[in-house]
Amino acid sequence: IHLTLKFLGEITDEQIHWVDQALSQITVEPFNVKLGVAGVFSKRHIRIIWMHLIGAEAIQKQVDNALSERFKTEERFMSHITMARVKYLKQENSRVLTYLDELSYEPHEATINSFILKKSVLTPKGPIYENLKIYSAKR
């Protein structure tokens, strides 16, 4: 499981190098997060079930600012944890949405000590993630 702060899509090796250089300039102290609301991407055809993390807004803003020269800020984007990818739902969207609305959980807090530049490759068996660079939070 990981927290997505920004989705870049398909980018070249040159762009990856530039992103690495930009993210290396971010200075962040360890910070606390807790689970927020659950939701889906595309209510019409659910593809992703996610949860928002409260407390990640500052680092998301820093990432957006660091990358703004080459990647536009998505106004509607919200940092999130992908809980599930959905391949196919046959007329079950309303049941999933109702379940998520009624979902209850203990709002545990966690400390984030780093952020990672990740590569994801979608395969028929699911996504494959590779850590390209880890950026440590500093006190």
Predicted segments, located by residue:
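Histidine-dependent nucleotide/RNA phosphoesterase domain, centered on the 2H-phosphoesterase fold
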Residues: 1-139
